[in-house]
Amino acid sequence: MPRVVLNGVTVDFPFQPYPCQQEYMTKVLECLQKKVNGILESPTGTGKTLCLLCTTLAWREHLRDAVSSLKIAERVQGELFASRTLSSWRSAADANGDSIDCYTDIPKIIYASRTHSQLTQVIGELRNTSYRPKVCVLGSREQLCIHPEVKKQESNHMQISLCRKKVASRSCHFYNNVEEKSLEQELATPILDIEDLVKNGSKHKVCPYYLSRNLKQQADIIFMPYNYLLDAKSRKAHNIDLKGTVVIFDEAHNVEKICEESASFDLTPRDVASGLEVINQVLEEQARVAQHGELQQEFIIDTSSSGLNMELEDIAKLKMILLHLEEAIDAVQLPGDDRGVTKPGSYIFELFAEAQITFQTKGCILESLDQIIQHLTGRTGVFTNTAGLQKLMDIIQIVFSVDPLEGSPGSQVGLGSSHFYKVHIHPETSHRRAAQRSDAWSTTASRKQGKVLSYWCFSPSHSMRELVQQGVRTLILTSGTLAPLSSFALEMQIPFPVCLENPHIIDKNQLWVGVIPRGPDGVQLSSAYDKRFSEECLSSLGKALGNIARVVPHGLLVFFPSYPVMEKSLEFWQAQGMSKKVEALKPLFVEPRNKGSFSEVIDAYYQQVASPGSNGATFLAVCRGKASEGLDFSDMNGRGVIVTGLPYPPRMDPRVILKMQFLDEMKGRSRVGGQCLSGQEWYQQQASRAVNQAIGRVIRHRHDYGAIFLCDHRFAYADARAHLPSWVRPYLKVYDNFGRVIRDVAQFFRVAQKAMPLPVPQAVTSSVSEGEAAVKEATLSSHSLSTRKAMSLDVHVPSLRRRPVGLPTAGDSESSVCVEYEQQTFSAQKRPMGLLAALEYNEQKAGASEEQALSSSTPSLRCEKRLSVEQRGGKKKVRLVNHPEEPVAGTQAGRAKMFMVAVKQALSQANFDTFTQALQHYKSSDDFEALVASLTCLFAEDPKKHTLLKGFYQFVRPHHKQQFEDICFQLTGQRCSYQPGNSLPFGEQAQSTASKQGRRELESKLTLSEGADRQLDPGEHLNQGWPHLSTHLTSKGDTSNCPKVGCVGEKPGQPAVNDYLSDVHKALGSASCNQLTAALRAYKQDDDLDKVLAVVAALTTAKPEHLSLLQRFGMFIRRHHKPRFVQTCADLMGLPTIGKGLELPCPRDESTTVPSELTHEDMKPGPSTSKKPEKTQSKISSFLRQRPDQSARSDDTIMQLPPRLPPEHTTSQWNFVCPACATEDTVLFQCPSCDFCRCRACWQRQLQASRLCPACGAVNRKQSIAQVIWPKPQ
């Protein structure tokens, strides 16, 4: 490797460094040798990470060599070097006054970046150098722990507590192996990143977390996320000693934000209430122990191994402290406009003093809180969520972070540090309320609108000064977007004698930069508040994007100011058809809000760009988002970057307002005007730095090239251009005509593609590892589906998911993929009863129910299960099972059972216990708010659990269903198909539910054509209204001629329609008639059978005499919905099913009894006295009888429909008509799990094709089919 001598230090570099890289390394050495701080900006792609590593490690080796020479000189006492005195060797070892006499005095290097993924890239760069230092990378237990029980804990603080408990009791065998195996060559010598630590730890059965802490003691360079350094609590937890170290912050443009956030907090009513609930539990538990006497108390504490060593009085005092804190916050008067009130930072000490939290008491309070958390660690249940207590501990440590000097009052210390802070108290706007507490200790705060206590730090200098006070030798801040450096240094309030603003290493033909003030249609492009959502601006921006996508090859990045702007733009473009035009050129990928889906989407984008024959892809992201922070879009992955606006912070946000006010106050106090930023300058820099970070994605190395499009007219202003990076400004050009933009960009890429070498193709990492050939096909299928899902806009943009799931627009294949991906609920989940009653049953049976996942479920359910597993990439399998002796999927208990198994698979044991206790509380108290609070914590955070939250709708009590749907939509962007009829009590929704298998949900949709009421012919109408049904009954009893419930003709004539509406008006009144007419019109337009039936059922089932109106409404139901309408009518009217009593399914009279003609008249086969029904039914029957070869086809068709009411007996000689083939047989056979009936021949054909019942999905055998036994007619 080439060697470069800089400032007397020889640096081994992987290649001959460029001039800008030599300049950068020289500045780094200047900081190290002079023990001063530095701010170094070097554009992305200039190799600053490699320069930092090589320079600092070369400097350490130089010091080490000097110390070695000194040791040798001391040992031989100058005999071998008589001409050189010992003092000259010592001066060589002393770096500008440092007293370095031994190897331990050589400074350690602490390399900090924002995330572990960025640190992994840094460690990869280190492996490419010739240096092989001792390396350590620090991480959290969440990332490094391999103990199965600890990993199950949901929260980080619970993992910490349980880990500490196991370490203290020596019950973690991974920790017990650390001392023995930490010196093994494979663990101590190589350069390991976070993944290597976990892999080697699992291989050698040694704890990676404590192994890294051991390696830290001997490491030359330590890698860690920089919140470990900036947060005093984290520094203490990881035992980080900063004295004499060299600290490097890479990607330091985020340091300001992290400094402020690590020293700030927001205390919500939920946090206080959660802490009080936990203390309540401990208090009650210890009180019960005390009542059993001293001997019993010792026995219980010994068996539980809780380690709690607190008096009952101390626990009660701790609860009083929290209650007083809650009262003090609630007592603050707020203005009536919900803006909140702001007080100086010192007010926090007054507020906490009212709750007896002071410098003098903080130690005892923190120790007590820690003991309670340790006491509850590892427990399960609703009261074991100690996150509230942990947050209170963190808050107390932040407020009282600076201990007072001896003899000085604590208030003065507080005043000295609090001028960097503001206290802001504002109403809680979140709907996630804590459940009301009902004990005598509770205050009324939880029953009012809560107040949030915010303690915000507005100066990063508070944390930076604290860092320097730890004895740091040199502090280096570096990034690609720090400009302007002077203002950045002013914010930190510590001296930075060394500054550098480096140019780029690229030539002029590798970068094109243009400001585009107007779109192709001449409309001004602007992301200003008053224009960003205007249709003209959105349309012009969409047209500009489409034109740019035509000329930019391969990957195109589009950055929006915020998520709402991106989502609104996509919504408009999709409505106008613009997104389809762009997708035809380059498929669209959208940056998701949640971190879990991001890697999936970005991998799909990379593969789309790299796929052979592809025109590339478009990636839509937001400034300050995940895609703009250190992600690699080199070469083809990012040939163009479009910035659609200046991403200013929200101007009306209280924190932004107070930050600007704070800076203005600080500037006013400083007599020298240039020593502090003003609020407006800070506001401008926040936008410009976000833009600079986004455009830094385009050039990633020396031979990369690309174009930058600044699509906002405000980029043409001089002040906006002045805040762009120095390497961009020389290439910037403002265009007044969009056509010239396209011409120049096309010319630029033609030249660049000829001049620049082709990029080395990167091998696509296979998702199939060795030894997994057996599942390769499934993995590839999953990956393909995952890619399609990543391309679906609806998946990642909540505003595009507002239409009901299951109704994608015509031709929208991407939307159909979205629906396919998101429908992870099962058909059995959509029933409105049975979950609460099945809790105890589920607890007994769930453990043994994982072996029959697909054997007893319906085909559609099995298909949905397979899809859901594939679409999740095989990360977790949710297997829904039933035992033969258990209720099948169609029953209420079966549906509840399957839902509970899915929930148990998705949640940890602790969270599942919380779920069950919340349900039991809801069952006993009907407390809907408490239920929602629990469900939100369990299912709302993880998008993969949104389907479970939505599926819970079926079990919510009717009077809470509408509220639940609104909350579900707010949290997930999905609705629960609420209809007005869902709010009826269960008894009114279905009078015979207890005796039925369970109501089927009406899923299929139909369309009522325009003017249907005018197209119906009364002459051809089968059931001419209720009077016809009640007076013209069949005289011979032939069921082929007996009208079924709701089975009316296909074309009701205008007289029949008028008669029906007239009867509705007379029976229900004008208001109800208008409501029914409106529902029918809506049914004609939206094709939603659920909606119209909900309205009709609500209107016609209130009184028994109105049930005939429900039946007669069948004249408007189309043929393919007749079976479901029949079943719904039967359920609502309480008609018995087959085998449970016989009653003709015809409308009832005023007394709701069967007409006498049905029970006394001798019924024999024969034509009906009703002419039109006779003609219609006889044609159908004769058609079926004349074509026996079609019976199987007819049967197959009927088998796909839900089970309809069983046919009535036809003759006194026990003859019946099969509903499928319409042939007569002496006996019908019935499914043992439902009311599905067929003749022997039809059952034989069905069982040969499938053993699953077409109606309920139960597994049937020939021996299990039950013969239908009828009472002999009198």
UniProtKB/Swiss-Prot annotation:
One Gene Ontology molecular-function label: ATP hydrolysis activity
One Gene Ontology cellular component: nuclear speck
SUPFAM superfamilies xref list: P-loop containing nucleoside triphosphate hydrolases
Region entry Disordered, spans: 982-1002, 1014-1038, 1143-1198
Biological processes, Gene Ontology terms: DNA repair; DNA strand displacement; mitotic telomere maintenance via semi-conservative replication; negative regulation of DNA recombination; negative regulation of t-circle formation; negative regulation of telomere maintenance in response to DNA damage; positive regulation of telomere capping; positive regulation of telomere maintenance
Cited InterPro entries: ATP-dep_Helicase_C, DinG/Rad3-like, Helic_SF1/SF2_ATP-bd_DinG/Rad3, Helicase-like_DEXD_c2, HHD_RTEL1, P-loop_NTPase, RAD3-like_helicase_DEAD, Rad3/Chl1-like
Domain of life where this protein originates: Eukaryota
Entry-linked CDD domains: DEAHc_FancJ, HN_RTEL1, SF2_C_XPD
Main localization of the protein described in the UniProt heading: nucleus
Record Pfam families: ARCH_RTEL1, DEAD_2, Helicase_C_2, HHD_RTEL1
Function: A probable ATP-dependent DNA helicase implicated in telomere-length regulation, DNA repair and the maintenance of genomic stability. Acts as an anti-recombinase to counteract toxic recombination and limit crossover during meiosis. Regulates meiotic recombination and crossover homeostasis by physically dissociating strand invasion events and thereby promotes noncrossover repair by meiotic synthesis dependent strand annealing (SDSA) as well as disassembly of D loop recombination intermediates.
Domain remarks in the Swiss-Prot or TrEMBL record: The PIP-box (PCNA interacting peptide) motif mediates the interaction with PCNA and localization to replication foci.
NCBIfam families (alphabetical): rad3
Protein's UniProt name: Regulator of telomere elongation helicase 1
UniProt organism field: Rattus norvegicus (Rat)
